[in-house]
Curated annotation (Swiss-Prot):
Locations listed in the record: Plastid, Chloroplast
Tissue: Highly expressed in leaves, to a lower extent in cotyledons, and barely expressed in roots. Present in seeds, seedlings and etiolated plantlets.
Induction pattern: Slightly induced by blue light, especially after dark adaptation.
Protein's recorded name: RNA polymerase sigma factor sigC
InterPro entries the record matches: RNA_pol_sigma-70_dom, RNA_pol_sigma70, RNA_pol_sigma70_r2, RNA_pol_sigma70_r3, RNA_pol_sigma70_r4, RNA_pol_sigma_r2, RNA_pol_sigma_r3/r4-like, RNA_pol_sigma_SigB/C/D/F
Region annotated Disordered, chain positions: 1-25
Main location: plastid
One GO CC term on file: chloroplast
Sequence motif Polymerase core binding, residues: 360-373
Classification via NCBIfam families: sigma70-ECF
GO molecular function terms attached to this record: DNA-directed RNA polymerase activity; sigma factor activity; transcription cis-regulatory region binding
Keywords carried by this UniProt record: Chloroplast, DNA-binding, Plastid, Sigma factor, Transcription, Transcription regulation, Transit peptide
GN (gene name): SIGC
Amino acid sequence: MASFNSFPIPKQIVGSSSSSSSSTSRPRILVRSSLTSSMTSTNSMLVFVHPHPLIKHWLSLLRSDQTSFPIFVRIPMTSVVATRWSFLSSVKEESRIYQNDSLKACGCASVSPYTAQNNVYVELKDPKENIGVGSAERSYSSRSMLQYNLLAKNLLALEETFVALDSVRMERDIMLQMGKLGAAELFKTCLSRYRGSSITSCLSDTTELVDTTPNQQVFVSSRRKVKKKARRSSVTAENGDQSSLPIGLRTTWNNIDVPRVRRPPKYRKKRERISRNETEMSTGVKIVADMERIRTQLEEESGKVASLSCWAAAAGMNEKLLMRNLHYGWYCRDELVKSTRSLVLFLARNYRGLGIAHEDLIQAGYVGVLQGAERFDHTRGYKFSTYVQYWIRKSMSTMVSRHARGVHIPSSIIRTINHIQKARKTLKTSHGIKYAADEEIAKLTGHSVKKIRAANQCLKVVGSIDKKVGDCFTTKFLEFTPDTTMESPEEAVMRQSARRDIHDLLEGLEPREKQVMVLRYGLQDYRPKSLEEIGKLLKVSKEWIRKIERRAMAKLRDQPNAEDLRYYLNQ
């Protein structure tokens, strides 16, 4: 007889019966594996079941006799073998639980196997065979009917189990594809959020099977939401949330002055660190400024570039210490310029549209930062950014006053012009004076009337001589503007007459005296020369040339025709 492999039926398959309530034995389905070559080639198995009464009645129309006959159902062997081992894991676990349950009685106490060679069978007798032959046969028939009902339920449970196994396989395939796509963690998170949904409830049995497999999938819920709620609750507790108080007590709670501990701001340490760094940086800038001032003084005294040794000797230190101080100062200067870039950009917006490029304004702002760092004193309690704003504005305004106009105006006049403009705006807004007099402006600003009038002359608009006179004219201002460099005919005649009279006057002097006077005042080439130059030309000292000049001037004053030259001075 062939060997059989037996395994317990899970709880979905096992039914209960009153006739077998006292029995504690578990029903088993006996399965014999096919070992012959014919079974291997067909890859199938036969299951023998007893026919239902309706099926039997339908078959009676085709057969004359009412004898019972077995029904064989062919099932593919590949599907049975594939599902057998995955099914055994869950069945064995459940069998341990239900073996101790005495309330679960087994209805099919006796199962007579019907074996055939090279096949697997499960045999149940016909419940209606030989009706009315005896009480023993009736009891056997009733037991057979009960066994058939239990078998139908078992087959239905087996079908549901196979469907669940397909779901497990499909879920594994989904997890494998998600892992290849790199979205396994996201899929697990989304699946854990809907843990209590209907999809999870439908796959509850499947989850038990997955937990027993070696490739166990563990779904860990995120604690981000829990941490967020905890932070909100802590913030609410610190702020004194009154949502838990009754409505009548909330107004009373608002009126109570609760003493609170004054905590230092979080950025206090940061502010202290920034101020300390600014103090150190300004100290380094001062060191470099002092060293450069010493070098400039040496170069002015010696008239040449100062060497490193002379520079170190004048500073009272060795060359190594001098280079160390210079490098430290240069580093501090660069860091200070970088840290104040945002402040310089903010202040440069006020000087846009005044004829200066934005890059030039930024450079002027950096110069102001270095000037302020040289004069910054941290012991007064002011921040460096507050103190240096004045120097940044001053440097930018100085550049605007120097290069914004085509005609250069001194910075003192520029300040006076700014004061005048502010005074006019004040008189217009407060007193309603649209055109204020110079005396009123002088009284308000404190400047003299003469200085205010000189400043008003500088406020005139400077235009181009190549600009057209009007929109309808093609004539330019250059055509109407006189050329002051050209002499008029009257001036040319007067100049020639004066030169002739001077030469006639010099004829009464000695040749050496006449030569010195011509070179001294440029009467020949219109280029006057100094005493030293004349001495080099005549190869004498400049003191000797001075004596000759004095003697010649004394002779010219004593001549009678010298009074005739006064006519040219009055013209």
